[in-house]
């Protein structure tokens, strides 16, 4: 009977959603009655060449200039030279981060899920444009803030190979990659290999504790920790095959092996609580991951497209942890295994250049087994089963552009016969009004669902130090966050401008909890007692000067948090980002500066110190050399400070790496190609627009 009520309610809401989508499509068809459907004229070539950024609905298309292409070693370095608003392209650590609220950056190549390793091996000559999807469709789920889609042409026939090296001169930091490909024009075979070797001897951790124990006595402790031991190493090997029949069919098959390991390392901490003694924590990990990804795209016609993506992963993780002090000694091993798979399908139909309807289905399965080996072995098994269905329609009515999407998700997690099933609607609404060719205003409404991690749900007590333990909470439940976004945008010649505001809130969020035991020790866990409000207001300004040989941008913003768990917290701060890049003949430079940023959840405040980077690069044919200086005049480099303040305790922990303070690094990119290069005409038309690995904890 209960399932019947749920089914009836779901079907009723589903009919309403489908009716709304149908009305939107019919309205669009009426508005397009006098157009020539897919044969509508493209923008004149002169206009596209004059405007490097073209906004169309939720997507901004960036057309790289000749100077930007010549000074970019690969597609990833080109992303950095484009200065995409709200995106931080870290050329040293090779990451993409979003600076406006939460969420990650999803990366695609020609609409196919991709990663940075693939961008490092993608020649700039194949790149047509970069699309920044500011409002991702409902198919991307809950944690994607923006999507970067690199539109590339088919590869040249022949053999190519290349090297991308990033190495520090002042500390032990190495991130190097090799790639090889053989292309016949339609078929392509390739190999990517990435090697990382990083030292830990300059890493540090510091903690200040203030605890009110049950007797009313305030206990203060200072802990100063230093790392020693083996270096972190990661080897990643990927083999792939791609079939690309232009405008008809694409098949991409990739298999990968990732070996991530950390030889035994020690954290030696000096404790000062009136007396002085030493604690030692030993850690060792060895994780191997085998992955398979298959992407299939079929263009039945210019109007109808089917996309299918299948991913499967197998993990094996061995983790050892030991702790010792004058009053406590505990050691355990974790033998973890995980098998997971994910299937995504999407079918889209284009009614006109401005009207499109997409529907899809996603299914994911995972099984995790963690065995804690100690005096008494303890086993935890987890089973995840999730389904997600979605539909989205987008179109335009005169100067008004809209996108209406709805998804319905079922998430189920089970451990030891207990767990939860969570059902959630995920609406997404977007509307844009264009005052003219220069000014537009956007509004976006969306909701996301956050699930508890396996570590947060594992009821195994871990000894952090002689006074503190951590234990998961199997009763945790998902929670929903609602977000409103409003922006005013302008693009005119050399000038780009955006004024934006973002407000998000949730109830019942997962937050840290501290409990004081009768013995005066502290146990950390998690609860669903959080409430959260987050507001951001900012401005972005960008300029292209000296015939696009100099680019500068600035983004100041004001951020405020109101968070409640055991206490009510109100925190505000001002953030500023500045950046510039320029070219003179074969020489170029890049630089950026970011002030400190903060975020808050429950009673936990996270403060990330500011960072800076400046580098000079030289390009000669297929060789690009870069010399850089990171975190100038910084004493400790980038560090993260976490402050957890409750009614009976206050913890302040700082973690960082001195190796990234005043770090001097050198980068080298080289590529070689032998074969027949295809002549490519200039792009003169607009082209319309996770797999969660679940590392064993």
Located regions from the model:
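Face-selective signature of the C-terminal outer-membrane beta-barrel domain
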Residues: 234-262, 280-418, 424, 434, ...
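Outer-membrane beta-barrel signature, preferentially recognizing the C-terminal barrel domain
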Residues: 419-420, 437-439, 449-498, 505, ...
